[in-house]
From Swiss-Prot:
Molecular-function GO term, any one: DNA binding
Annotated source species: Nitratidesulfovibrio vulgaris (strain ATCC 29579 / DSM 644 / CCUG 34227 / NCIMB 8303 / VKM B-1760 / Hildenborough)
GO cellular-component term (any): cytosol
Comp. bias (Low complexity): 755-767
Catalyzed reaction equations: NAD(+) + (deoxyribonucleotide)n-3'-hydroxyl + 5'-phospho-(deoxyribonucleotide)m = (deoxyribonucleotide)n+m + AMP + beta-nicotinamide D-nucleotide
Gene Ontology biological-process entries: DNA repair; DNA replication
Key words, A-Z: DNA damage, DNA repair, DNA replication, Ligase, Magnesium, Manganese, Metal-binding, NAD, Zinc
Function: DNA ligase that catalyzes the formation of phosphodiester linkages between 5'-phosphoryl and 3'-hydroxyl groups in double-stranded DNA using NAD as a coenzyme and as the energy source for the reaction. It is essential for DNA replication and repair of damaged DNA.
EC number: 6.5.1.2
Ranges where the BRCT domain occurs: 634-723
Protein name (Swiss-Prot/TrEMBL): DNA ligase
Length: 799
């Protein structure tokens, strides 16, 4: 297959999304120092924390920390991985785009990955980015196209022959949620493109936003109707697009602003633009609105001047923005620079400093979490910060209060950076009147009056009473939450009401509730009560070992560690018997985590809870595993230790479910095709990952064969052995013919398509003959030593 770089035919060079091939990063000297255990544990904790906050922000729209706090965690992890490169792995948040796709809406793979952007917060960091760019491409042009960085929901709208056909949220960058019906109601989205020169197929990428004035009116209507108020325009936009009832979406003041394209299929010829500014002009001609204030800057210095000027008047703009996106204007230079594992090397987000406001610190209240940690919360005189009313802010711990020198009654500086939870920056000492009072951290729990302790080496104070009402309440809420057992339809407010009323004293109590029990509560009718009971019963019978371990709330055990434990122990009995030495032999489990697990199982109250869970049938074993041998804690799994990657559109289950099944069989999930990959599982239209795997001689297995292998419990692949049955050469060639290289956006001419078109979304018999799918010559196929045949379709990579 040939690629077109801004109209010139060159040798095919698929996007290489493996981090080790990052040309810009390759200039950094390798570090081989021994990794201290503290650094290893801190990196593991940072990865778990960042993944959790990614999910809260991108998927659930309920962030718990500010952008500035997230950036600080992210940069700390980058620093550790830079200092000790062996800490970096493919699952690190620094190597990925985003988080996982929510259930509830249909999922669909993006034809081409929707990448994230790297960030800069200072002129020095902008200069460092420019230097890296010129190191990688010395003759790179100096002009950049600049847009405001909008604070909305990123998605992709797709047009066939000029007519709107579908829309996908960005999701995790590779798979998004189908929101076609909702986007059809967005008034400024063209349902048909203008002009005669529209592409045969085009994927337009942009942001769904709500203007500030429209947001105020929306919240006023919500308030008048007694509905829930939105925290900010981004949450309102994201929630509106994800509505299953499109009449609700139609009533929301949404706008779609286009900033780029994915795949483009032309009737003939080459792309009608050679610059990003030219692309933006063409998008406007086709009928799209584009971000306001977009501008072509002739040099990096001009970009910085644009950034400063826009930042000075951001409050006067009609939409919420939190920075500037600068993209190298020349598309041929973009193509030459390519991508890292998570972001383009030719674009950068220049973030604005957080928005700030003055207000009074009226009080500091202490809350108790599920692990007994006491967290101080600032109670503020309500103030608007960046268009959102702020009345509370977390202070994290006593040390932060002391370090900032806060006193009750202080005038303080508060900031937020586009998310819900703000930060108290500092007290305005110069405005003190003498009436301010020092805050004294409580010596007793505010919920149960038990003594509070601060363990040596920790910043947190803890309530040591295991029967503390707050600890019990938060533990039960966590047990059924998305971070725990993930019980759909059982809301936090109902659980809190049941616990506070004394009707439920442990997680087990929830599963013993009957429909009649629930109908005694106000606003809990027969249907709601039945749904509540059904949801809990479904969670009880369908729980996986991973989710149960997460639900138990063992300190230092997040979802990734829970997956590791579930992959190595048959059930909680086996895990309970494991000693600290056995646990520390597992990936990412050090002395602290192992000690926490052992402490959990040494607690009599926890053991009693486990027996009660067993009694109600909530006792899952490791998925697809035979019982462990007598006296053995861990078992050998079909895919134990193998690196597995999924690509293409899966038909049996979603990508997340497939990855969970592979993990349960002992596999490690990879994020890209590298030499260390053991197995690539392909669905429909697998694209560039399949082509790259063939070039590297990596084993390839079709979706149906993979699930058949899991069902049998016997692995058909071993990284140390040759493939048992290779596909006959004739079938291999037929299966590989015209497989599209989809590393980034590309343009094809319609006249070059033969057989089953790669743009065809049909299934069934058509999918069987899809030339982008591998042949069915056996359970596995490989093309070691063979070059994948090139098609004649032309490609152009665009952001």
């Amino acid at each position: 297959m040939t690629e077109v770089k801004t109209g010139r035919v060159v040798d095919d060079a698929p996007v290489n999304d493996a981090p080790e091939n990052n040309a810009a990063e390759a200039t950094s000297p390798a570090r081989h120092d021994a990794i201290p255990e503290e650094a290893r544990q801190r990196a593991a904790q940072l990865r778990a924390d960042l993944e959790r906050h990614n999910r809260l922000y991108y998927e659930l729209d309920t962030p718990e920390i500010s952008d500035a706090e997230y950036d600080a965690l992210y940069r700390e992890l980058v620093g550790l991985e830079t200092r000790w490169p062996a800490l970096r792995d493919e699952a690190s948040p620094t190597q990925r785009v985003g988080g996982e796709v929510l259930e509830g809406l249909e999922k669909q793979a993006h034809t081409l990955r929707m990448y994230s952007l790297d960030n800069a917060f200072s002129r020095d960091e902008w200069g460092a980015f420019i230097q890296r760019m010129y190191n990688a491409l010395p003759d790179a042009p100096s002009a950049f196209w600049c847009d405001p960085k909008m604070d909305g929901l990123a998605l992709e709208v797709i047009y066939e022959n000029g007519v709107f056909t579908s829309a996908l949220t960005r999701g995790n960058g590779e798979v998004g949620e189908v929101v076609t019906a909702a986007m059809r109601t967005v008034r400024n989205l063209p349902l048909a493109l203008r002009g005669d020169d529209v592409p045969r197929r085009i994927e337009v990428r942009g942001e769904v936003v709500i203007a500030k004035a429209d947001f105020e009116q929306l919240n006023a209507r919500q308030s008048a109707a007694g509905g829930k108020l939105f925290a900010n325009p981004r949450n309102a936009a994201a929630g509106s697009v994800r509505q299953l009832d499109t009449t609700v979406t139609a009533g929301r003041p949404l706008q779609f602003l286009a900033y780029g394209v994915g795949q483009v299929v032309l009737e003939g010829g080459t792309a009608p633009w050679t610059t990003h500014s030219g692309l933006m002009a063409r998008l406007r001609e086709w009928g799209f609105d584009t971000p306001p204030e977009g501008r072509l800057c002739a040099s990096p210095d001009e970009v910085w001047a644009y950034y400063e000027a826009l930042g000075a008047r951001r409050e006067s703009l009609a939409i919420e923005i939190d920075g500037v996106v600068a993209k190298l204007d020349d598309t041929e230079a973009q193509e030459a620079l390519g991508f890292t594992a998570r972001a383009p090397r030719w674009a950068l987000a220049l973030k604005f400093p957080a928005m700030q406001a003055r207000t009074r610190l009226d009080d500091i209240r202490v809350q108790v979490g599920r692990t007994g940690v006491l967290t101080p919360v600032a109670i503020l005189e309500p103030v608007r910060v960046g268009g959102v009313e702020v009345s509370r802010a977390t202070l994290h711990n006593e040390d932060e209060i002391r370090a900032k020198g806060l006193m009750l009654g202080d005038m303080v500086l508060v900031q937020r950076a586009g998310d819900v939870i703000p930060e108290v920056v500092r007290p305005l000492v110069e405005e003190r009147t003498g009436d301010e009072r020092p805050f004294v951290f409580p010596e007793n729990c505010p919920e149960c009056d038990s003594p509070v302790v601060r363990p040596q080496g920790e910043v947190a104070h803890r309530c040591v009473n295991v029967m503390c009402p707050a600890v019990r309440r938060q533990s039960i809420i966590h047990f059924v939450s998305k971070a725990g057992l993930d019980v759909r339809g059982v809301g936090e407010r109902w659980v809190q009401q049941l616990v506070d009323g004394g009707h439920v004293t442990s997680p087990v109590g929830l599963f013993l509730l009957t429909k009649l029990d629930l109908m005694r509560f106000e606003r809990m009718g027969p249907t709601s009560a039945a749904n509540f009971v059904t949801a809990l019963d479904a969670a009880r019978t369908g729980a996986t070992l991973v989710r149960l371990i997460c639900a138990l709330g063992i300190r230092h055990v997040g979802e990734q560690t829970a997956r590791t434990l579930a992959a190595n122990f048959t059930d909680l009995d086996a895990l309970r018997e494991a000693d600290a030495e056995t646990l520390q032999q597992l990936p990412d489990i050090g002395p602290e985590v192992a000690g926490s697990i052992r402490s959990f199982f040494a607690n009599e109250g926890n053991l009693e809870l486990l027996e009660r869970l067993r009694a109600i049938g909530l006792w899952p074993k490791r998925q697809d595993a035979p019982p462990a041998s007598e006296g053995a804690d861990a078992i050998v799994l079909p895919l134990q230790g193998l690196k597995v990657l999924f690509t293409g559109s899966l038909t049996r289950v979603g990508r997340t479910e497939a990855e969970d099944m592979a993990r349960a069989a002992g596999a490690n999930i990879a994020s890209s095709v590298t030499k260390s990959l053991d197995l690539l599982v392909v669905g429909g239209k697998p694209g560039s990952k399949l082509e790259k795997a063939r070039k590297l001689g990596i084993r390839v297995m079709e979706e149906a064969d993979f699930f058949a292998m899991l069902a049998s419990g016997v692995a058909s692949v071993d990284a140390s052995e040759a493939v048992a049955e290779e596909t006959p050469p004739s079938q291999e060639a037929a299966g590989a013919e015209d497989a599209p290289s989809q590393g980034a956006a590309h343009v094809r001419t319609a006249s070059d398509e033969t057989g089953s078109a790669s743009g065809d979304d049909s299934r069934g018999a058509a999918a069987e003959n899809d030339p982008a799918r591998p042949a069915r010559g056996g359970a596995m196929s490989t093309a070691e030593g063979e070059d994948v045949p090139r098609g004649r379709a032309e490609q152009l990579k665009l952001f």
